[in-house]
Amino acid sequence: MRIDVQHSQHDIDDELDTLYERLHQPGHRLHGLPVIALGRSGLIVRHRKADGEYFLYVEDPAARQLAGYTVFNRLPELPRRADRYLRAPHTRLRGSAQRKGLATTLYRWGLDAGLCLISGARQSVGAARLWTALAHDYRHGFVDVEGRALRYLGEAVADDVHGALHTRRLLLGNGWTLGELAQATGMTGVDAAEYANVNVRRGEHERHSVPSVGRARPVAHTAHVTHVAHAPMR
């Protein structure tokens, strides 16, 4: 996965203007989409699903323009089992709508609904920062998709592995554990990577904590998980 994407803001604004016209053009397939208010922001979100992909169009009614959109795409390089559960978010924002937490809100909608997210082969600097921020609140890691096989690599990878186009980031939606996702998608490598992650965390803890003689106890590895339906978003 490479952090090398750069966008032309002029082209993005033109695309958003074209989409806005289609959303308000009677007879067009984008006309009359369902609407959800985006909190107290004054913005609204028009949404649709097509061919297993989810489209969120964020409209600013006062300005009569689109602030941006997010599409949760299917990835052709994923195995069929994984395609049912993983989507790759793709976002475009108008310049005036950037750095206001809009993309974060839309990604959280998907994650909180139980959708698991996977990155594309390339990201912009802004997208990479967003994924890193979300990783503080959601289970995360890296996966390898080479040969249309999904293999878990752990919560951190070496620089050369990170830079490979078949390495992707992963964010788990609400209610999922790595084990459940591995079982649902056929993802391999979870047990080995989890063992490595535990050893790393244990080593860091031992380096930064003061030993207490006679009070050592095993680390609990179980946690209560509130489960949600693991079917794809509808």
Feature annotation, model-predicted:
Residues 80-95:
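Conserved acetyl-CoA binding element of GNAT-fold acetyltransferases
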Residues 1-81, 116-234:
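Terminal substrate-recognition subdomain of acyl/acetyltransferases
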